[in-house]
Amino acid sequence: MSHRTSSTFRAERSFHSSSSSSSSSTSSSASRALPAQDPPMEKALSMFSDDFGSFMRPHSEPLAFPARPGGAGNIKTLGDAYEFAVDVRDFSPEDIIVTTSNNHIEVRAEKLAADGTVMNTFAHKCQLPEDVDPTSVTSALREDGSLTIRARRHPHTEHVQQTFRTEIKI
């Protein structure tokens, strides 16, 4: 049995599903006569709504739950850097992805079972303060399973209001 990461598994699945959908578009008209089926998620939502009525998640609520209660610690200011730690002890290093985008840091992890199904997930997202250099984000995984994220602060500079004048001849 070969060891695959969640990224490899997702890449294989997305390739197979996209290639199968493109091949189905070229299939004969007999296959187009099959009745349309609801995607599995829509069926699940429909069954949920039947039992509990209409329920929507407020936009302020997170989509994922931390791996452990209190999984994300407080953000600390350490000199010229910010630092926070998250508990990802249930995941292998290759299961963890840290991304910086649009002034946010996001930590995601996904553990797969041997059959390729998702066993456990983790997601934590936080907004970077305005004085952080987003290209300076680093992470380190400790032996106890905590992932430490650090980001350097921009040096404090006085904001100087620039005054200028532009003249255009018409």
UniProtKB/Swiss-Prot annotation:
Gene Ontology MF, one: filamin binding
Keywords: Chaperone, Cytoplasm, Nucleus, Stress response
One Gene Ontology term, aspect cellular component: nucleoplasm
Start-end of Low complexity biased regions: 16-31
InterPro entries, sorted: A-crystallin/Hsp20_dom, ACD_HspB7, Alpha-crystallin/sHSP_animal, HSP20-like_chaperone
Region described as Required for localization to SC35 splicing speckles: 1-71
Primary location class: cytoplasm
Region (Disordered): 1-39
GO biological process: heart development; regulation of heart contraction; response to unfolded protein
Coiled coil ranges: none
Keyword Chaperone: yes
Compartments, as annotated in UniProt: Cytoplasm; Nucleus; Nucleus, Cajal body
Summary of the tissues where the protein is detected: Isoform 1 is highly expressed in adult and fetal heart, skeletal muscle, and at a much lower levels in adipose tissue and in aorta. Undetectable in other tissues. Isoform 2 and isoform 3 are poorly detected in heart.
Residue ranges of every copy of the sHSP domain listed in the record: 62-170
Highest taxon listed in the record's lineage: Eukaryota
Record note on quaternary structure: Interacts with C-terminal domain of actin-binding protein 280.
Recorded family membership: Belongs to the small heat shock protein (HSP20) family.
Name of the protein this chain belongs to: Heat shock protein beta-7
